[in-house]
Regions:
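Anionic-ligand binding patches
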Residues: 2-5, 12-178
């Protein structure tokens, strides 16, 4: 099988995807590229549009991944920031997020991931969800594999550690990551 090309501007995302595919015997090439993101709160649409752009740049089959982060009881805006994680500033200013959420008791949240493969003719999309809650403080150590600063505040369901506190083995073997 020929290699697949993964397009992203986020090296942490690449490392995570590469490991998952290696376990299935598939080699993933990395192509660093920032793609235009449509201004819509729809992960499925955004991922498909990025795959189209990536295919136009490379001229060969590609896949991209996009994620949303949804805080179910964000004050006055349930589901925030959704697909707008980067643009909202939530992932770059996690301390501000914690301050905003300080009086919220139900801290349920989740990541929604969409992986899109485009061969120039057909789109194939795959989805994953990781449910959990926000911690009350930043926790964990710096990790080059971190896809987002939200790793320091996201505690997956049935876990007591944030993603940033977990070892690679703990993160890969948690109940919601199968």
């Amino acid at each position: 099988m020929e290699n697949l090309t993964y397009i992203t501007g986020n090296y942490g995302k690449y490392v995570s995807v590469k490991e998952k595919f290696e376990n299935a015997g598939i080699t993933i090439d990395y192509f660093k590229c920032d793609l235009d993101e449509p201004d819509v709160n729809d992960i499925e649409f955004i991922s498909k549009e990025k795959a189209r752009q990536a295919y136009e740049k490379l001229g060969s089959p590609v896949f991209v991944a996009d994620s949303g982060f949804y805080i179910e009881h964000y004050p006055d805006n349930p589901g925030y920031p959704g697909a707008f994680v980067k643009r909202s500033g939530v992932s770059s200013n996690v301390s501000k997020l914690l301050e905003t959420m300080k009086d919220v008791t139900d801290r349920s949240c989740y990541f929604l991931d969409c992986l899109t493969f485009f061969d120039g003719n057909e789109y194939y999309q795959f989805f994953g969800i990781s449910r959990g809650s926000l911690s009350n403080e930043l926790r964990g150590h710096e990790n080059k594999r971190a896809k987002s600063n939200l790793w320091y505040v996201f505690v997956p369901d049935n876990c007591i550690k944030t993603l940033a506190e977990m070892t690679d083995e703990e993160r890969n073997n948690r109940p919601d990551n199968r």
